[in-house]
Amino acid sequence: NYFISNYPQYSFWQPEHVPQLISLLNSPPQDEPIPLGIYFHIPFCRKRCHFCYFRVYTDKNASEIKAYIDSGIKEIERYGQMPYLKGRKPKFIYFGGGTPSYLSVAQLTELTDRMKAVFPWDEAEEVAFECEPGTLTEKKLDRIRKLGVTRLSLGVENFNDHILEINGRAHRSKENIRSYNYAKVIGF
């Protein structure tokens, strides 16, 4: 058995595929284009869970996180200028990780404002956002909702504190319940 820790797998990409991809992106859609989805990866966490096999970073400061966000936005802006994607509105947005809710309210606002400037998602069917309950405050959940997020994945994993502890989770059951209850209050 093996796990996929990067998607698509590195073995998927072959040098001979690059010209075809560039050609597609540099051409306007011929027919009804395939619905557009955007995944933005946030590889930061408060701590590494014992079962996690993904590349995550637990020791990054605000300036390093800003540099990562800036690089991701630069890539989005580049793709947003390509004829195949220019002017399109995504059908779905997914913020995965790591832990997207690790970002501060200011970082989340900057990230999403800059993304929406390139790919507005006011008509998206779903905007999904992964969380770790211990990183959520009412202020942050309110902001996440106002940013247009329609679905939360709370990352509860378990309600037994002993199991959470032995799995290396940073949160405990009371944070699961608090986050869930407030998310329901504000319409998730």
Say what each PLM segment does.
Residues N1-L36, R46, K86:
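Flexible, acidic/Gly-rich N-terminal and inter-domain linker regions that tether
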Residues P8-Y10, P43, P100, P133:
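Proline-rich low-complexity regions
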Residues I34, C52, E123-E125:
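Residue-level signal for beta-strand positions within conserved beta-sheet cores that form or flank
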Residues F40-V56:
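Local cysteine-cluster metal-coordination motifs and their immediate loop/turn environment
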Residues V56-Y84, P90-F188:
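Conserved non-cysteine loop/helix-boundary elements of the Radical SAM core domain that shape
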Residues L36-G37, F92:
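Structural motif
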